[in-house]
Amino acid sequence: MIKTSQIAKYIFLLKKAEFIKSEKKHVILNKTTLKKMVFILQNKYDEQTVFFILEKLKEIGFHLATQSGLSLGIDDLKSFPDKKKLITETRTDLNNNEEHFLLQNISPLEKSKYLITKWNDVNNFIIQRIKKVFLKKEPLNPLALMAFSGARGNISQVSQLIGLRGLMTDPLGKLVEFPIQGNFREGMTLTEYFISCYGARKGLVDTALRTATAGYLTRRLVYVVQHIFISIEDCNVTNGISVEINEKSSNSLIGLTLLKNFYNKNIFIAKNTIISPTLVKLLLNSYNYLSHKKSIVCRSILTCQLQHTLCQFCYGWDNARAKRVAIGEAIGIIAAQSIGEPGTQLTLRTFHTGGVGGFSGANWISYNSPFDGFIKFKKPVIGNILRSWIVMPHYTSLNLVYKLTPSFNELNLTLFIFDKLKNELYNKTLKNEGLLFVREGDFIKKGQLLFSEININFKNSNLLKTYIPYYSLETGLIISPKLALNKYLYPLWIFLFNIIKLNLDSLNSKKFTVYKNYSILEKNDLIDLKTILFEIHFIQKSKKFNLKKQEYLLYQNLKMSLCKSHYDYSTYKKLNVAFQQNNQKLNFFYNKKLKSSLVSNNINLLWTSSSYSINILTKSIFNIIVFEYLYLSLLIKNKYILWILSKNLKKKDKFHFFKYTSTSSSKIEIFRLNSKKNSLNIRKNKLFFYSQNYKKNKVSNILFGNSIFLKFPLKKINTFFSQIKQKTINLKEKKTSNVEGEFIGFQLKNNIKFWYSISPNSLFSFKKDNKKNRYNFNFIRKNSNISGFLVSNTIKTFTLQKGIPLIFPSDTIYHKMEKDFIFKNELLCSFKSLKPETQDIIQGIPRVEKLLEGRPLPFYKPKVELYKIWQFFLKNLGFLKIKNSLFNLKKVESKVYLNNFKPNLNIGDICYLAYFHSKSNFGLDIASIISNVYLQEGVNISFKHIELIVRELTSLVEIINPGDSGFIVKEKIHWLLIYNYNKRLKSLNLKEISYMPIFLGMTEITKKKNSFGVAGSFQNLREIIIDHTFTRKTDYLLGLHENVLFNKIIPAGTGFFF
């Protein structure tokens, strides 16, 4: 049992440590204050004293928790009082946004972004209100104690319990634009429950599958840097990186070592001094007084001159102890675990959040008005009117957004809000670049958006432009008025139609889908497609004909076909059919001439013909023949274009056909094109037939009238004749059409007819009521009392077809052309956007993995970027002729410090300088990208850990010209080894080695290690054994892994060198 006197003693120790520095008498020790307390204690006392205090604090915590008997019941889940009112206001706002969309003021993407942003703001507002209610009214609520102390859960989970769940993610990680307005306390509707299951299932799948991915990432990182530890105090490097002195870079300055003396007026800092938080504050306070030096040159891990290890000065501060790192510290293992471990933990965290979307929109810092009033600016605003997809769509009275541009020094905009009596109520000074949503003299309401600061680095941001597909919401015809609203936005209309997709049995007109009148067939393509050319229905007039049937005894391998008497017919009336007919020729064009033949003998062109049996049920209709072409698994030897020409069926055309009945089971007709023939002619008004079963012993016979042509050495079994004397008219059975409305024909250049119908629901008429200036085929928007496409204008009425107006940015990629038909949920276009999507570590881990493996990302290609930067430095080295100058590469947001520059450079010096600058700039760039992935999840990984990984991935160089050395072109060697070789070659007046930097991924760099133990135990053991055997490599056991394998003491540890 802990006594009260002991508790007082420990609290006295805390006061002695100057931790409690507040005017309040009581300080709540939550997670944040505990972190601060441990940090102060660590700086104030030794490790043993700090350990003693923290151990006793733990005992106090367990004792008080047992004594309190904390429990959580359903009564502790208090509902949020203003939730219904807030949701009603949000719905009204979203309805207004829908009106903007129908008025063609905003694009579909902006509509979607506004919905997502609005519900995200609602969720954040509810979270803030829950915090205030709990902290003020119920600070001892068990739910509040757990969430705010950091012991269990977070405020996001509390919001799902008593607030609203908000927008959920689907299995692909995208947001479902249907917010769950209920919570677990109130319950959810059936629709909300099913959407909620999306996110819950995603959490389960991610936990089951992605945890292994995070663990494997950690394993590869450890293999890359396990051999790195602190070996000496100083490597005597002369180059470093330049870090700007400002508030944004203040955290990155802490723990770095100065490369050279820094002095400016009253400030002097000696070189090799570690920058502490106190020094950072001193530099920031004197920032405005600095004349020409607004940056400071520091050492970096990327510039350390040691090959296998690091020095104390280049590494800097030990983050765990806030002191200079000790010699022997295994910093490689620490760096690998620091990057890999958050991935494992955050993967598990997505399971507990239940799939609720997290937004990358946190990069936007918004300021809202606290009162009603009028806007007044202190000085004129410098900026441009912006109307684009970059901004988050917030709408003022004039739908204008101002993008502010910084002045020569800094942007300093002060907003004043006055009431009606011109009393100042509120003022806010804005320092960052951003978007202004109000104008001078505007009347604003409480809570209205005033300004948004942009806190985005577009090069490294996950909000980079990506193509987002847009699918049509309706079926109809695409029309573009060809009138741009401005240079950024273009309008588009989709008019509602019912496109017919029916069989001939249901409707007397058939829809034939024709996408284009030619096909380009590539070499080695396998084609399996079937297109109907046309079908013929006919009505039989009074006609007599003989029907003859004969049977023959056939041998086993003999096949034959019988042909009945032909039918002679003509059309009885005009047929309402639209069809595509093979017009005269079927031509094959090749991309090059062949010497031997046009078509290979192995290519078969297959045709099919459908035969129909006549019985009682089907005798009223004859389907004579279906003309079609079929490519069945046809292997194209060379590229050619197949042209299908089109022609209409004319009235009272007369045809003669033969109807075949095959005695075999096969119904495929095979034609082999002659190698000297490049066209197949089909002529009208000629008797023609295609023989079936093109095989070895095939025999055909043809009967004309009563004539018999038989050359058959077989025994005849029986013969019978039948004659039809009566006149018959066979009519097609009538059926009710399942399509209603008015049919409209639509004809293209090649006489291909389309048929589509306008349903009664998409047409409406109204009286004119003195409306003027209305003409046929006018586009009429909403709020003109009518909206759509004017198709009829009579004396008394208008007839209007409903349509959906859309606008898209000018760089949109359209997948449909004007006057094309589009079906519902069919892809219409793709457009670039900075649309915020859900960002969790599940999307972050693959991005980090790709970067560290050297694979290209949509916005970044590591290997290409490194090569470009190296070429840039190689071409511009002639401009670096000033000693002690700062060199700034414009494409990358970092500076490299160059000391003791010599104008007369040889090839070795040029290669070293170009490699050094490109490696430093590229390393800082890719390290910042990886760091941002974790920062979006609230995990702050020390920059030096990422620099350590990148340093190893860029440590090898590729030899371009070996010079007088014994290396081989394209051989990959450590850069410091080449640097020392060049020094030796230069002293002997021999030709030096020229080389270029390369970026190898984690897997590649591990395989290229000189250590057989590391490379062999990683993967591809057989390949590693062959490589090390033939090249006779020696493993010097320099790393930790190799020594553990061979049961030797590891060359690391803070007591190893003493």
UniProtKB/Swiss-Prot annotation:
The keyword Transferase applies. It catalyses: RNA(n) + a ribonucleoside 5'-triphosphate = RNA(n+1) + diphosphate. Its cofactor is Zn(2+). Keywords: DNA-directed RNA polymerase, Metal-binding, Nucleotidyltransferase, Plastid, Transcription, Transferase, Zinc. Zn(2+) binds at residues 235, 304, 311, 314. Belongs to the RNA polymerase beta' chain family. RpoC2 subfamily. DNA-dependent RNA polymerase catalyzes the transcription of DNA into RNA using the four ribonucleoside triphosphates as substrates. In plastids the minimal PEP RNA polymerase catalytic core is composed of four subunits: alpha, beta, beta', and beta''. When a (nuclear-encoded) sigma factor is associated with the core the holoenzyme is formed, which can initiate transcription. This is DNA-directed RNA polymerase subunit beta''. It comes from Helicosporidium sp. subsp. Simulium jonesii. The gene is rpoC2.
